[in-house]
Amino acid sequence: MSSVTVSIDPHVHSVASYDGHEPVELILEHAAEIGLDAVVITDHDTMGASRRAEAIAGEYGLIGIPGVEVSTAHGHLLALGVDRMPPRRAAYADTIQWIHDRGGVAIVPHPFQRSRHGVRRRDVPLSDGVDRSTGDEGGQGSPAPDAIEVFNAWLFTGYRNRRARRFATSYDFPGVAASDAHHLQYVGRAFTEVRIDGRASVERVTAEDVLTAIQSGTTRVDGRRAPVRMAARHYLTAAEEKSRYYAVRGAVRGVTATVAGTKAAATLGRVGFAQGLHRTRRALSWFR
C-alpha cells in the first residue's frame, strides 16, 4: 500500500488571539516557505481566523484544517476539524464528546501545566474505564482525547514534555508536537509528521486523512524548544496582554450594561408617566 508523510503544526495562534500577533496570511506563507504541509490556527475561543485560514490554505499549497483552543471547565483543549466553536467552560469529557460528535479530533495541549491552563492529570478522561484517582477499573469510561501534545515548544525545560510523553505512552495515546507559536518566527519550531496510508502524493491528502491518521497514531514528533529568554518574555507579555484584553472586555460589558440599564430606566419612566397620566385623567373624570 502506498503512503505519504505530511508535516503539520497543529497548534498556532494568530492575531485573533489576545496574545497572538500575526495575520493568517503571513502564517500560511511562512508555513509553506519552511516546508510544512499544514498549519492549524487554534486561537483562544474564537474560530473566525481559523476558518479563513482553512478557506485560503490551498492558495499556499497547504492542507486547510480548522481548529480552536477552547477553554473548558478543567483546562484548555484543542479541537481540530470542527466547523463551529465548542461550548466554553463545559466539562472536559463533555467537550471531547462534542468534538467527536462533529467529526473532529480532540488533542490535549501542554498537559499538566496549570500556569498555562493545562488540564490536570486526573482530569484527562480515559476510554478504558480506569479511575486514575483511585486506580479502580471496570467503570463506564469517558470520551477520551485522540492525542496528547507530548512536545510543546514553549516550555522552559523538557520536564513537562517528558511527563506528557510518559503519560501518552502509559495510556496508549498518540503523541503530537506543536509550536504553540504566537509570533511568526516560531511557527513550525515543533511539528508532527503524520503518515497517511493509501495516498500516493501530498497533493491528494485531505484534512480528513490527516485527522484520521492522528487518531490512528501514525505520528512522529520533531522540533526544538524556544529559547528560555524568549519563553520568559512570552509568558510575561502574554499575562499582561491577557489582563489588558479582559479589562477592556469587562469595560465594554460594563458600558453595555450601563447603557442597557439607562434605556430600561427610561422605558420604565415613560411607562410610569403614562400610567400616572392615565390614573390622573380617570380621577378628574369623576368631577365632570
PLM-predicted stretches and their roles:
Residues 66, 70-72:
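A glycine-rich, hydrophobic loop/mini-helix early in the fold
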